[in-house]
């Protein structure tokens, strides 16, 4: 059996996006499922659009997710270089070789001419295509242009009567007629290869066997098959085009939509666990056989199958991601949870100094992502307790609140062990004496300790206070009720 070799080939023109991440994950899982090799190649020839941290963003964030390349610019193998910018001479030579074989030609058309043709096609309700002005240019005219050092691109001659077909790994048989294509540029005027030309040469040189990528590349595949044919490359990878990822409105995720979190760095900053995010992204377009929702990396590799990859749009459901992440958070040990959550903890409770760990643990079973801890603390604790105001509120609601609290303080004072279970039992026993239960029992106590009517388990909150502080707080409240 041939060794499966897949690749992920991003351009460092931006930061790692969920769409590119899903592509990388699927290629990684396919390779590893068959004990193959996963390669990361950087398509960095668009120097004007490349950003400084573009390459690091790709590698650092994929590594954070557990997606590690067998070969890359940082871990080169025998199929380099892994930066397209280091291979420009190879592309250029092959482009000129195609001219010699009459399979490509120099195009001297100006940008203005091409733009004029494009606008005219649009005005005539036609798909803009290159009209072949230079395809059959006489050799004397070519020589004249070259003597004047006129700039030119190199275009591939597309056979309009041909058909370009492949059995798509995701979508089945796809056929695109040559008449739907145009003579594409394979080498730009600055001598740099275009995407479609360079990617064919790279995939061939690196012996890539399978290519999974976004649906937007379907038309590119037809062009690339034409390039494979022109170059005489017999070993052609299998192509699969993944589903479109859509937002809640059904529109394709757009990197320009700043309202939607969709870059991996953003998810890191907001406190999503890498295992949870990997799990979620792997389910975007891949449907496990047994409707299982939770997979670690090993399980993903074992279960991944192209037969379960679908072409229907994949809904990027942030609520599902939060649900998955919450489940992963719950599975953390208390120590691991606090080490995780402490990275995001900004809000402090001024009357519970040095209790950050205990306070954070109150929310372990309800938090969906790291930064949410601050919102939950703000909702559950006041920064300063206004005893008189709270006493007045409770006094109006519960006329016998003072007697109840006096007995509660006395009973709590008698506890030998200051634990949530014992505290809860004591509250219920005292409440029963005064025929208090539910809201009437717990809300006044919660107001005392948090200044809020709702929040985490009350007994665990009280446990965070040492016994003396808790009882003193209740007594302050009792004294305040004397005002009413």
UniProtKB/Swiss-Prot annotation:
Q: Where is this motif: 'KMSKS' region?
A: 252-256
Q: Does the keyword Ligase apply?
A: yes
InterPro entries per record = aa-tRNA-synth_I_cd-bd (IPR045462), aa-tRNA-synth_I_codon-bd_sub2 (IPR020751), aa-tRNA-synth_I_CS (IPR001412), aa_tRNA-synth_I_cd-bd_sf (IPR008925), Glu-tRNA-ligase_bac/mito (IPR004527), Glu/Gln-tRNA-synth (IPR000924), Glu/Gln-tRNA-synth_Ib_cat-dom (IPR020058), GluQ/Sye (IPR049940)
**Keyword check for Phosphoprotein:** no
GO annotations under biological process? glutamyl-tRNA aminoacylation
Q: Which Pfam families match?
A: Anticodon_2, tRNA-synt_1c
Where along this sequence does the record place binding of ATP?
Answer: 255
Q: What class of enzyme is it?
A: ligase
Query: What reaction does this catalyse?
Result: tRNA(Glu) + L-glutamate + ATP = L-glutamyl-tRNA(Glu) + AMP + diphosphate
Motif interval(s): 'HIGH' region: 10-20
In terms of PROSITE patterns, this protein maps to:
AA_TRNA_LIGASE_I
**Which of UniProt's keywords are assigned here?**
Aminoacyl-tRNA synthetase, ATP-binding, Cytoplasm, Ligase, Nucleotide-binding, Protein biosynthesis
Give the main location.
cytoplasm
- Can you list the GO cellular component terms from the UniProt entry? cytosol
Coiled coil regions in record: none
**Compartments it resides in:** Cytoplasm
Q: What's its EC?
A: 6.1.1.17
Self-association state and partner proteins as the record states = Monomer.
The family database entries (NCBIfam families) matched by this protein are listed as:
gltX_bact (TIGR00464)
Q: What is the recorded function of this protein according to its Swiss-Prot or TrEMBL entry?
A: Catalyzes the attachment of glutamate to tRNA(Glu) in a two-step reaction: glutamate is first activated by ATP to form Glu-AMP and then transferred to the acceptor end of tRNA(Glu).
Q: Which family does it belong to?
A: Belongs to the class-I aminoacyl-tRNA synthetase family. Glutamate--tRNA ligase type 1 subfamily.
Instruction: Tell me what this protein is called.
Output: Glutamate--tRNA ligase
What is the protein's species of origin? Mycoplasma genitalium (strain ATCC 33530 / DSM 19775 / NCTC 10195 / G37)
* Gene designation per UniProt: gltX
């Amino acid at each position: 059996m041939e060794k499966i070799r897949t690749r992920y080939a991003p351009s460092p023109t931006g930061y790692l996006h969920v769409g590119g991440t899903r592509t990388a994950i699927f290629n990684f899982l396919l390779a590893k499922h068959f004990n193959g090799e996963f390669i990361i190649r950087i398509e960095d020839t668009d120097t004007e659009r490349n950003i400084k941290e573009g390459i690091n963003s790709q590698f650092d964030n994929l590594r954070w997710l557990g997606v590690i390349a067998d070969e890359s610019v940082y871990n080169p193998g025998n199929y380099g270089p892994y930066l397209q910018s280091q291979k420009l001479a190879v592309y250029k030579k092959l482009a000129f070789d195609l001219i010699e074989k009459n399979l490509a030609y120099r195009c001297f058309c100006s940008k203005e001419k091409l733009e004029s043709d494009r606008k005219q096609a649009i005005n005539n309700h036609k798909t803009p295509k290159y009209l072949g002005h230079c395809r059959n240019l006489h050799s004397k005219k070519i020589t004249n242009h070259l003597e004047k050092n006129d700039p030119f691109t190199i275009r591939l001659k597309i056979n309009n009567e041909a058909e370009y077909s492949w059995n798509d790994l995701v979508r089945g048989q796809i056929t695109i007629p040559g008449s739907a294509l145009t003579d594409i540029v394979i080498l730009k005027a600055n001598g740099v290869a275009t995407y479609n030309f360079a990617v064919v040469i790279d995939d061939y040189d690196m012996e890539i066997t399978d290519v999974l990528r976004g649906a937007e590349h379907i038309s590119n595949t037809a062009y690339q098959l034409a390039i494979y044919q022109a170059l005489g490359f017999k070993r052609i990878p299998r192509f699969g085009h993944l589903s479109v990822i859509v937002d809640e409105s059904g529109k394709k995720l757009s990197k320009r939509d700043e309202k939607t979190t969709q870059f991996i760095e953003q998810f890191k900053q907001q406190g999503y666990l890498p295992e949870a995010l990997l799990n979620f992204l792997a389910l975007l377009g891949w449907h496990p056989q047994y409707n299982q929702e939770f997979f670690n990396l090993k399980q993903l590799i074992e279960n991944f199958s192209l037969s379960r990859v679908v072409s229907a749009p994949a809904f990027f459901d942030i609520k599902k991601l939060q649900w998955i992440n919450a489940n992963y958070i719950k599975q953390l040990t208390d120590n691991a949870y606090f080490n995780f959550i402490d990275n995001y903890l900004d809000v402090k409770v001024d009357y519970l100094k040095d209790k950050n760990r205990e306070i954070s643990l109150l929310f372990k079973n309800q938090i969906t992502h790291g930064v949410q801890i601050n919102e939950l603390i703000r909702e559950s604790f006041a920064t300063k307790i206004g005893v008189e105001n709270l006493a007045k509120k409770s006094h109006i609601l519960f006329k016998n609140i003072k007697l109840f609290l006096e007995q509660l303080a006395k009973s709590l004072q008698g506890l030998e062990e200051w634990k949530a279970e014992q505290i809860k039992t004591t509250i219920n026993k005292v409440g029963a004496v005064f025929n208090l239960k539910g809201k009437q029992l717990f809300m006044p106590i919660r107001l005392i300790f948090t200044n809020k009517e709702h929040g985490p388990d009350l007994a665990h909150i009280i446990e965070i206070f040492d016994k003396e502080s808790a009882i003193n707080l209740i007594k302050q409240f009792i004294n305040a009720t004397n005002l009413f």
